[in-house]
Amino acid sequence: MDMQSRIRQLFQASIDTKQQAMDVLAPHIEQASQVMVNALLNEGKMLSCGNGGSAGDAQHFSSELLNRFERERPSLPAIALTTDSSTITSIANDYSYNEIFSKQIRALGQPGDVLLAISTSGNSANIIQAIQAAHDREMIVVALTGRDGGGMASLLLPEDVEIRVPANVTARIQEVHLLAIHCLCDLIDSQLFGSEE
């Protein structure tokens, strides 16, 4: 197969996955946006975490809220737990890599805050511990997962929201996660500041 054919094949696979996910995920993305808006209206904040590409997604979400998405508006409180290398490495060294997010959540999380927990497999041990810590702090969890939801899915409480991409290929799951994050940012902005024509 020549390279351009492979590129077209990858584009088509991404398009197909997004089309399959659209109707399945729309109600969950809507619900997650409402949970986040409710938290923000009640002086809560967003914490986010993930590993690898999902860490990048956590940072992307946080930056869109703190800075701006597609319009001028006030900054919104959001912290990506993936950015402080000194904190992450000290926790990993002194305790365990599995605690790099949970220890931060126990310090920073407050009742009514929201944790955006991202894992394509749903089985990342440090994300599972982050969810447990968020529940201990009376936070609501929005979980971005894929495949069968993994161990994360079984931890979620009725007030939590899972956005599970119906796919098994990591790259396709990540692509839908990014689109879901952009949808969340758009919906948060429109609910807080009104729709832009």
UniProtKB/Swiss-Prot annotation:
Its EC number is 5.3.1.28. Its cofactor is Zn(2+). Zn(2+) binds at H60, E64, Q174, H182. GO terms for biological process: carbohydrate metabolic process; D-glycero-D-manno-heptose 7-phosphate biosynthetic process. GO terms for molecular function: carbohydrate derivative binding; D-sedoheptulose 7-phosphate isomerase activity; zinc ion binding. Substrate binds at N51, G52, G53, E64, N93, D94, S119, T120, S121, S124, Q174. Keywords: Carbohydrate metabolism, Cytoplasm, Isomerase, Metal-binding, Zinc. Binds 1 zinc ion per subunit. It is found in: Cytoplasm. Residues 36-197 form the SIS domain. InterPro entries: GmhA/DiaA, Phosphoheptose_Isoase, SIS_dom, SIS_dom_sf, SIS_GmhA/DiaA_subfam. It catalyses: 2 D-sedoheptulose 7-phosphate = D-glycero-alpha-D-manno-heptose 7-phosphate + D-glycero-beta-D-manno-heptose 7-phosphate. GO terms for cellular component: cytoplasm. Pathway: Carbohydrate biosynthesis; D-glycero-D-manno-heptose 7-phosphate biosynthesis; D-glycero-alpha-D-manno-heptose 7-phosphate and D-glycero-beta-D-manno-heptose 7-phosphate from sedoheptulose 7-phosphate: step 1/1. It is an enzyme of class 5 (isomerase). Catalyzes the isomerization of sedoheptulose 7-phosphate in D-glycero-D-manno-heptose 7-phosphate. Homotetramer. Belongs to the SIS family. GmhA subfamily. The reaction produces a racemic mixture of D-glycero-alpha-D-manno-heptose 7-phosphate and D-glycero-beta-D-manno-heptose 7-phosphate. This is Phosphoheptose isomerase. It comes from Pseudomonas fluorescens (strain SBW25). The lineage of its organism: Bacteria, Pseudomonadati, Pseudomonadota, Gammaproteobacteria, Pseudomonadales.
